[in-house]
Amino acid sequence: MATLTQKQNAPKKVFAFRWSGVNRKGQKVSGELQADSINTVKAELRKQGVNVTKVSKKSQGLFSKGGAKIKPMDIAIVSRQITTMLSAGVPLVQSLQIIARSHEKASMRELMGQIAADVETGTPMSEALRRHPRHFDALYCDLVEAGEQSGALETIYDRIATYREKSEALKSKIKKAMFYPAMVILVAIVVTSILLLFVIPQFEDIFKSFGAELPIFTQFVIGISRFMQHWWYVIFGGTAFAIFLYVRAWRASQKVKDNTDKFILTIPVVGMILHKAAMARFARTLSTTFSAGIPLVDALISAAGASGNYVYRTAVMAIRNEVVAGMQINVAMRTVDLFPDMVIQMVMIGEESGAIDDMLSKVATIFEQEVDDLVDGLTSLLEPLIMVVLGVLVGGMVVAMYLPIFKLGDLVG
């Protein structure tokens, strides 16, 4: 019985329908409507005085964005749209319905339509969001719930929108920072492999006709080329298999994830970027949750999860344990030996002045700017580095292949 009731109360899926018909004046009209079924479309149009002649479900084209996957940035944009409409005096349900009708993605229209339907029937916004954990995490829902309880949903949604926008911008910067080193390595591997497998063997055949002893450097390069030709399937197959095993272990084992988090923080430049990004996320999350009225002890749990790294997650949970025991947060931060003195001093000033959320927001802004600067610097550094790496690889092999030709020229001369 409970299962039947649950099914009956489950939110209906919303689809896009194309329709055409005749209005009360006898004029032909057509358009699109979001609804859960063709019957609902016909019923809604009858209320508007339209005699429906044709209704069909709108199909998604091959390159249409309609059925695209919902991304975190979509949620950030929707959060900002809700903030704008609430500040303009539009009721929450109507705001959700407007987004559900107008969004370009069918998946987002369906999601927002379900949330709007739930809220319209009396379900609290936070509870309606909790039914979609893939798109709205616990932190998001907790903040909305805090806004509902305090009667300041508009203010809270403004903070949520800002938080999500900053988080996505930071995530994008981190991806960019990781992308460039990966591209340098990939390009170097591809170029080297092509030269060793296809170009060097051509020269080797030419050198055999010389019948002369080759320079040491040329012999060394040809030896590597022969090794690659005979064992390329083992090299590439073994590498692919090792990557597969690592990815599988990473997904299955928390310990592997934790060790990976520790390792990447030690990588030059990239590790520094990730350190600063983790501190920015910690400060931004703690500022947002604390300013929303969530108790500091609970806010620290959210900040630990949002830090995105095992080292920082463990450190923040250790800070929380000290705070639970009665220690001030700035003193607790000193015990983990991870945060810079500047951060600890700003937190201490915030505690003493009663404006810890403002100070943490400033800390987050500082580190977000530092991440921006580091990523831009890394980009500027790697552009010439790619040229140098390729120049050394290609140039070295070209020299190795032309040394015998120069030597032959000297002998002839």
Curated annotation (Swiss-Prot):
Its main location: membrane. GO terms for biological process: protein secretion by the type II secretion system. One of its GO terms (cellular component) is plasma membrane. The chain crosses the membrane at residues 180-200, 227-247, 286-306, 386-406. Keywords: Cell inner membrane, Cell membrane, Fimbrium biogenesis, Membrane, Protein transport, Transmembrane, Transmembrane helix, Transport. It is a multi-pass membrane protein. It is found in: Cell inner membrane. InterPro entries: GspF/PilC, T2SS_GspF/T4SS_PilC_CS, T2SS_GspF_dom, T2SS_GspF_sf. PROSITE patterns: T2SP_F (PS00874). Belongs to the GSP F family. Involved in the translocation of the type IV pilin. This is Type IV pilus assembly protein TapC. It comes from Aeromonas hydrophila.
